[in-house]
Amino acid sequence: MVNTAETSTSFSIASKVKDYFQLIKFTLSFTVVFSCVVCYLLAPNVIGFDWWMITVLFIAGMLVTGSANAINQAVEKDTDAMMKRTAKRPVASGRMSQAEAYAFAAIAGTVGVLMMGWFFRSSENGFNWNAALLSAFSLFLYAFIYTPLKKINSIAVLIGAFPGALPCLIGWVAATNMIDPFGTLLVNGREYLNVGGWVLFAIQFLWQFPHFWAIAWVAHGDYSRAGFKLLPADKGPTRFTAIQAVMYSVLMIPVGILPYYFGMSGQVSMFIVLAANLFMVVQSLRLYRSMDVKAARRVMFSSYIYLPIVLLALLADKA
């Protein structure tokens, strides 16, 4: 005979775990932390694959990113409830209180930031303040600047692009404990310019504009009902939005060559990145020509596959 009390408890625990996965936006957080881990591995002083350090970086990254997302959902409880896409989130639906979300965010964010500093300390510099402070800054920028700004002005997309790209720099700095792009790293008798983290940051920074505007185009109805101002023009999807998507896609081409130029990776990855960038330009131009949701959706899905292809190509072809 089934013990109904035990079944109820198991269901309750499973539901709570599911709520926390939704609270931290697990899929989004995983994507963000993925870029952080790959950029850590791209640092010249990281040789081989240390599962322990990768696991620690993954956990720390998920805690910091999850903290930012939890605050975002607590702040946007009412607006999330207005949108079909987000109405079932734990705070918006009432399954979790704002206080619980904030408490989780405070604990997760603090632990994640401390992990970044402690576990990635170096014998020369000790506690990795660069990685810890960058993580804290990224969390603050996303949760307390970008989140409220979304209802005020579309410049929020520009502001949000910084915490969106900082994981690349954080991963690099976790490995090098150096933020200065003009500093040098000595690895096996060879000097490397510490510009790599900033190059990777630039790639992910520019990528976010066609990516996010495509999402905002597709979900414009939902965003409008919630009062979010995320497109370059207040009137909604316009030719100007498409031009912006094309412009940033084109800018991604020269920036995509920089890893090869600075000796971070080889020619094979350079051509793969170039091909991926040209593909993004083509999709953005199609959006400019057709000005419809179908084309915006193509840009959106193209951007989803762009980042893992580019990052993994650079890692596989690491110099």
Question: Positions of the model-derived regions?
Answer:
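Cytosolic, membrane-interface loops and tails of multi-pass inner-membrane proteins
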Residues: 2-13, 75-96, 213-241
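Membrane-embedded alpha-helical segments that form the functional core of polytopic membrane enzymes
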Residues: 34-42, 46-77, 85, 109-113, ...
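Functional transmembrane core segments of multi-pass inner-membrane proteins
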Residues: 48, 161-216, 220-221, 225, ...
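Transmembrane alpha-helical segments that form the membrane-embedded catalytic/substrate-channel core
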Residues: 63-71, 140-148, 201-220, 253, ...
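Multi-pass membrane catalytic core of lipid/isoprenoid biosynthesis enzymes
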Residues: 85-131, 236-260
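Intramembrane alpha-helical segments
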Residues: 98-178
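Hydrophobic alpha-helical transmembrane segments in multi-pass integral membrane proteins
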Residues: 169-181, 252-259, 306-319
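Interfacial loop-to-transmembrane junctions
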Residues: 237-240, 281-309
